[in-house]
Swiss-Prot record:
Record GO biological process: glutaminyl-tRNAGln biosynthesis via transamidation; translation
Catalysed reactions, as listed in the record: L-glutamyl-tRNA(Gln) + L-glutamine + ATP + H2O = L-glutaminyl-tRNA(Gln) + L-glutamate + ADP + phosphate + H(+); L-aspartyl-tRNA(Asn) + L-glutamine + ATP + H2O = L-asparaginyl-tRNA(Asn) + L-glutamate + ADP + phosphate + 2 H(+)
Role description: Allows the formation of correctly charged Asn-tRNA(Asn) or Gln-tRNA(Gln) through the transamidation of misacylated Asp-tRNA(Asn) or Glu-tRNA(Gln) in organisms which lack either or both of asparaginyl-tRNA or glutaminyl-tRNA synthetases. The reaction takes place in the presence of glutamine and ATP through an activated phospho-Asp-tRNA(Asn) or phospho-Glu-tRNA(Gln).
SS bonds (residue pairs): none
Pfam families reported for this sequence: GatB_N, GatB_Yqey
Gene it is expressed from: gatB
Protein name: Aspartyl/glutamyl-tRNA(Asn/Gln) amidotransferase subunit B
HAMAP family cross-referenced by the UniProt entry: GatB (MF_00121)
E.C. number: 6.3.5.-
Family from the record: Belongs to the GatB/GatE family. GatB subfamily.
Subunit structure: Heterotrimer of A, B and C subunits.
Alphabetical keyword list: ATP-binding, Ligase, Nucleotide-binding, Protein biosynthesis
The UniProt record lists the keyword Protein biosynthesis: yes
A GO term, aspect molecular function: ATP binding
Native source species: Staphylococcus epidermidis (strain ATCC 35984 / DSM 28319 / BCRC 17069 / CCUG 31568 / BM 3577 / RP62A)
């Protein structure tokens, strides 16, 4: 028997507002524990929540960017549960009247485009954070009340690979809207996954399992791959899948049972009595719609159709707004489009990955990178020299030409000097001359390599090729 995998994702995104969802406390990451709190966050008796208007605007902006319908009538509800980092013993969320419904995004997997439906987007407040260490439980309520949106996909995803592509695309769109930075390492984007299997051709869904502790897109993919295999083996052996919540263990790559899954009845939802229902008229919707910036698909189309970039380059450059903005800034400073694309996808990305930093953490600017690329383009700097200059540019900033001169890496373009390197290479490699005469193309490349080695990579490669060909033809 063969099974079809059915996956749905629930993504929590922290909104990048200055204050919390229902209180004026700061909503910034990284403060001292319990310093960003007030009487509302601590659930003092008698205090009343006040809705953050900007959070509502941004939830609407995100919904619109995800092609969703905005509800004219929406409301908040209480989700009741007890936990030490939830001082009210309930969370203010939205149950049956979310702010956004019926959206979609298009993903690309193996060259094919697929549309993934989005059921709903609703607003809620985050809980605090509990840390368990050495027999003690520590509670930090800084995060309590931080504005969240939860984005719930339709069960349209059919593989862990599609789930990864969906998350990449979703993060990209949300980042472009400016409502969140979507940093998983800081908790501003979190994902839970629901997965079930059913025999091919069966319409009814199988029993789903929820996966938690998925701290990166890669772990989402790995957790789903393991669970897909586990459920298939269980079903083939005649077993049954329970409705469970399971935790992904990063060290073993396996999922571990946490608890039997609760249903919505367990939370005893009821309308929040301290907040009036939201009425979103057409004027409000129109004002928010005007704030939606250019989104990744629009930029990608522009890069392909207007700038002539390959589809792959355009896809990589538009994955994050930071990289896309940097690319546009560099070409605005006169850098060649394709050379800039190659450097951002190659040397720049390698540097960022190696040092585990983001563009904003470096001293790179669109202007100084464009300056280096223009030197490469006009032949002043070889690619080999550029690779030696670039780390200094990224770490300390400055001017690429000045760095090149300070390091004694100025490219040799003087013909007399280059001719000496050429003749030395020919005199030392008579067999290569013979090979060239006999039509062996590799001989030319070998000789160029010898010249570049002798000049420590500083010889102008274009002039070397020209002079070498002349000398070979004359011998």
């Amino acid at each position: 028997m063969h099974f079809e995998t059915v996956i749905g994702l629930e993504v929590h995104v922290e909104l990048k507002t200055d204050s919390k969802m229902f209180s004026p406390s700061p909503a910034h990451f990284g403060a001292e524990p319990n310093s960003n709190t007030n009487v509302i966050d601590l659930a003092y008796p008698g205090v009343l929540p006040v809705v953050n208007r900007r959070a509502v605007d941004w939830a609407m902006r995100a919904s619109m960017a995800l092609n969703m319908d905005i509800a004219t009538n929406s409301k908040f509800d209480r989700k009741n549960y007890f936990y030490p980092d939830n001082p009210k013993a309930y969370q203010i969320s939205q149950f049956d009247q979310p702010i956004g419904e019926n959206g979609y995004i298009d993903i690309e997997v193996d060259g094919e485009t697929k549309r993934i439906g989005i059921t709903r987007l609703h607003m809620e407040e985050d809980a605090g954070k509990s840390t368990h260490k050495d027999g003690y439980s520590l509670v930090d309520l800084n995060r309590q009340g931080t504005p969240l949106i939860e984005i719930v996909s339709e069960p349209d995803i059919r593989s862990p690979k599609e789930a990864y592509a969906y998350l990449e695309k979703l993060r990209s769109i949300i980042q472009y809207t400016g409502v969140s930075d979507c940093k998983m390492e800081e908790g501003s984007l979190r994902c839970d996954a629901n997965i079930s299997l059913r025999p091919y051709g069966q319409k009814e869904f199988g029993t789903k399992t929820e996966l938690k502790n998925l701290n990166s897109f890669n772990y989402v993919k790995k957790g789903l791959e393991y669970e897909e295999k586990r459920q298939e083996e269980e079903l083939l052996n005649g077993g049954e899948i329970g409705q469970e919540t399971r935790r992904f263990d990063e060290s073993t790559g396996k999922t571990i049972l946490m608890r039997v899954k609760e249903g919505s009845d367990d939370y005893r939802y009821f309308p929040e009595p301290d907040i009036v229902p939201l009425y979103v008229d057409e004027d409000w919707k129109a004002r928010v719609r005007e704030t939606i910036p250019e989104l990744p698909d629009e930029r990608k189309a522009k890069y392909v159709n207007d700038l002539g970039l390959p589809e792959y380059d355009a896809h990589v450059l538009t994955l994050t707004k930071e990289m896309s903005d940097f690319f546009e800034g560099a070409i605005d400073h006169g850098a060649d489009v394709k050379l800039t694309s190659n450097w951002l996808m190659g040397g720049v990305n390698e540097y960022l990955n190696k040092n585990q930093v983001e563009l904003k953490d470096t001293q790179l600017t669109p202007e100084n990178l464009a300056g280096m690329i223009k030197l490469i383009e006009d032949g002043t700097m070889s690619s080999k020299i550029a690779k030696k200059v670039f780390p200094e540019l990224a770490e300390n900033g400055g001017d690429a030409k000045q760095i090149m001169e300070d390091k004694g890496l100025v490219q040799i373009s003087d013909e007399a000097t280059l001719l000496k390197f050429v003749t030395d290479a020919l005199d030392n490699n008579p067999q290569s001359i013979e090979d060239y005469k006999n039509g062996k193309g590799k001989a030319m490349g070998f000789l160029v390599g010898q010249i570049m080695k002798a000049s420590k990579g500083q010889a102008n490669p274009q002039k070397v090729n020209s002079l070498l060909k002349q000398e070979l033809d004359n011998r």
